[in-house]
């Protein structure tokens, strides 16, 4: 039985070529590395939801992220809180984004932006120099600020750290960043959408810089 499962997994090979890559959940780390090497931000097209699942259910991929130690930002939830329920202001959710981002930068986490089946207004509403800088989507601008040799001063990360330090958030990570300015080498950014492969570009292109991203169809091994 175990041997049969191994054979099935081996048959589900990732394909990191062409306009849209294809990758089983178990090989995502390989996909991240390939996209990083190609200077592209991974845009995961989540195809892991079973066909008989309800519309509002978490997909296996979303569940995987929820149990991971990565920095998760639920952008669809933020849209609902700001626009539908009006429970929070844009400034409030931006501060939440900034805190998650700062922790990820200090601890070397992956910043996972979950869009679900929505087109969150990244460019026109949520992105800001002190919260979710637009440069996060450009690997060529992320790489130079990371690690001991990274140049934070004058780069996009400087405004983010300065704002947090000025606000006096009680976060040890911010104090360390403000004093030493070293951003962890392992920091990465991933965006996840549940739009279908044939639909994602139409829905996301106005708010997200798709030209800087690598679409990756993610599936579960069967």
What are these regions (language model features)?
Residues 1-222:
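Conformational switch/transducer regions in large eukaryotic molecular machines and scaffolds
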């Amino acid at each position: 039985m175990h041997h049969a499962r191994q054979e099935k997994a081996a048959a589900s090979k990732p394909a990191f070529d062409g306009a849209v890559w294809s990758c089983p959940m178990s090989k995502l780390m390989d996909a991240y590395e390939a996209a990083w090497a190609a200077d592209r931000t991974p845009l995961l097209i989540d195809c892991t939801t079973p066909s008989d699942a309800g519309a509002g259910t978490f997909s296996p991929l979303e569940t995987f992220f929820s149990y991971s130690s990565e920095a998760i930002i639920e952008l669809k939830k933020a849209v609902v809180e700001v626009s539908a329920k009006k429970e929070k202001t844009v400034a409030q959710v931006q501060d939440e984004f900034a805190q998650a981002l700062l922790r990820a930068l200090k601890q070397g986490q992956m910043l996972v932006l979950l869009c679900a089946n929505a087109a969150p207004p990244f460019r026109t509403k949520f992105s800001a120099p002190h919260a979710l800088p637009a440069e996060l989507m450009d690997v060529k601008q992320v790489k130079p600020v990371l690690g001991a040799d990274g140049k934070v001063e004058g780069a996009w990360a400087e405004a983010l750290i300065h704002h947090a330090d000025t606000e006096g958030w009680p976060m040890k990570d911010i104090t360390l960043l403000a004093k030493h300015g070293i951003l962890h080498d392992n920091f990465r950014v991933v965006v996840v959408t549940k739009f279908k492969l044939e639909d994602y570009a139409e829905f996301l292109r106005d708010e997200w810089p798709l030209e800087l991203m690598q679409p990756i169809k993610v599936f579960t091994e069967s």
